Structures are given as C-alpha cells and as structure tokens.
Swiss-Prot record:
Organism: Bacillus cytotoxicus (strain DSM 22905 / CIP 110041 / 391-98 / NVH 391-98)
InterPro entries (alphabetical): Ribo_uL30_ferredoxin-like_sf, Ribosomal_uL30_bac-type, Ribosomal_uL30_ferredoxin-like
Protein name: Large ribosomal subunit protein uL30
Pfam families according to UniProt: Ribosomal_L30
GO biological process, one term: translation
Length: 60
C-alpha cells in the first residue's frame, strides 16, 4: 500500500508563475494553510518537487 502524504500550502501563490499556480491547484490546495492528504505516487512527488518552496509535506 502506498504511503499517504499530508501537503499544506504555507506560502502564497501571488506573484508566482502560472505553471506553479496550476500545480498548487492540481494538488487540491486553494487557500493558504489548506491541507490535503494524497497517495505517494511519482506524479504527486513531481508536483511537490515543483512547488516545494510553497508547501510543507509530512507523512500522514
């Protein structure tokens, strides 16, 4: 079974490039300090890597 990751948006997307905004939205994060739980898949890990400066990640 894949591990679960708890992803929290900790920095704003204001002033960020459109691709980073789209990645944050694709992760399901809409507001600051919003948290989602996702399965650890290569796609999700790539998205986290792209916006790692905006989010914090913990194992759920």
């Amino acid at each position: 079974m894949a591990k679960k990751l708890e992803i929290t948006l900790t920095r704003s997307v204001i002033g960020r490039p459109q691709d980073q905004r789209a990645t944050v939205e694709a992760l399901g994060l809409k507001k600051l300090n919003a948290t989602v739980v996702k399965e650890e898949t290569p796609a999700i890990l790539g998205m986290i890597n792209k916006v790692s400066h905006l989010v914090t990640v913990k194992e759920a």
